[in-house]
UniProtKB/Swiss-Prot annotation:
The keyword Nucleotide-binding does not apply. The keyword Ribosomal protein applies. SMART domains: Ribosomal_S15. This is Small ribosomal subunit protein uS15. It comes from Corynebacterium jeikeium (strain K411).
């Protein structure tokens, strides 16, 4: 369920601070969100795939921590990001 190179590059161009940015919280959160959405779709059809469900929960927890970090350090960037990603918060 990994992201293809094209998906990753496109996501980083849209949400990264620059084209090759992979370390900023925005870029990491965006990549995690894309992976979470892919796994969510997978689990709709494979309800008994508990190993993938656990992986999904780990990704959600990692994203939650990064969102908390961003909210504490720069509220404007946080609000902009959740609006662009369409996250509920």
């Amino acid at each position: 369920m990994a992201l293809s190179k094209e998906q990753k590059t496109e996501t980083l161009k849209e949400f990264g601070l620059h084209e090759t940015d992979t370390g900023s919280p925005e870029a990491q959160i965006a990549l995690l969100t894309v992976r979470i959405r892919q796994l969510t779709e997978h689990l709709k059809y494979h309800k008994h795939d508990h190993h993938s469900r656990r992986g999904l929960l780990l990704l959600v927890g990692r994203r939650k921590g990064l969102l908390k970090y961003l909210a504490e350090n720069n509220v404007d960037r946080y609000r902009s990001l959740i609006e662009r990603l369409g996250l509920r918060r």
